[in-house]
Amino acid sequence: MILAAALAICAASCSEWTDPDPKFHDPVNINSEAYYQALREYKKTDHAICFGWFSGWTGTGSDLYNQLRGIPDSMDVVSIWGGKTGLSKEQKADMKEVQTKKGTKVLWCQHVVDLGRDITPAGHTALEYWGWNGSSYDGSDEADEAIRKYARAIVDTVKHYGYDGCDFDYEPNFGYRGNISGSPAAMHVFLSEIANHMGPTSGSDLILAVDGEPQTLLAETGPLLDYYIIQAYYCPGDYNLDQRFSGLLAKFGVLEDEETIMRKTVWCEDFEKYQTSGGCDFVTRDGIHTWSLMGMAMYYRPSLPGCRTGGVGAYRFNLGRSKSDYYHLRAAIQQMNPASK
C-alpha cells in the first residue's frame, strides 16, 4: 500500500501537533494530480520527517530498489549514499520526478574529512588548487580562505546537479578525522560558508544537515543547521536516546532551547543490518517493547509534553524494499504522522 498524503497535517506549535482532529483528508484517487498536490502540500507542513540514506542508485531498470520513484511517497528527505556525481539522464529524470511530483527533498551526502575531498580536480594537489593543505587546522587566513573556497565549490556542485541541499557526514571520532573534521573551529568556517547558501539562516529552501557527531561541533554552529541527524544504531531504548539528546542539549542549549533542539533531531537506525526487522529490540520509557525504528518514532521528552522530534530515518533504507516493501518505514511514518480516518 502507498502511504503518503493520507497524513494529518501538523500545525506549527508542539501542542497543536497532538490535536486529534484531522486537518487533511486523502483524495479518493491516489493516482490523481489532486493526490500529488496534497502530498506536496503535506510535505510543506510542520511535521516529523522520514529520512534515509539511499544506496545503489541507478534511476532505471526493472527493480525499483535502485530508483527514487520506488520509495514510499511520504518519505520527506533522501540522502544519496555514493554515486552522487556524474548523473546519468535516467538518474536526473528519477530525481526530478520525485522532487516535482512528490515534493521529496534529495540531498548531496558527503563525508567531511580533509580539504578538497570529492571536489579537487584530477591532476591537482589540494595545496596548489585550494591554497592550503596543512596536516591540521592552524586558524590562519590561508586556511580559512581555502576552506571557504572548498565550501563554495561544494555549493556550486550541489546546485549544478539540482540537489535540495547537503547532508554532511561528520565523524571525527570514528575514523574520519582530517584537517577540517579534526577541528570544530575549522568545521565552523566550513559550515558557515555553506550556510550562506543553504540552511535556516540562508533565506533559501535548501537543507543543511550534519549527521554522525553534530554534538562535537561548536555551539555557534548549531543554529546554522536544519537537522541534527543522529546515527543511533542498535539503540535498545529511550534511555539511550535520552543520553544522546543530553549531549546535544549540553552543546547547543546555550543558543537553542530544548524544544528547538528536539524538533531538529532525527534518530536513525541501520537497515544494512536490520532491513528485515526494522531494528533491534527496543523498550520505551513507558515499558512498551517494539523494534528500534518504531521506538524512535515514539520518542518523546517528559519535559516537553506533546513536542515532536525532527523525525526518524535509516541507513541504506532501500534494502528493505525487497524484504517488506518498506513496511517498517511506512509504520514509523504512520506513528509520527497518523493518517486521517
Where does each model-flagged region fall?
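Secreted glycan hydrolases and related glycan-binding modules that recognize and/or cleave
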Residues: 14-341
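Sec-dependent signal peptide recognition
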Residues: 1-4
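C-terminal motif of bacterial Sec signal peptides marking the signal peptidase cleavage site
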Residues: 9-13
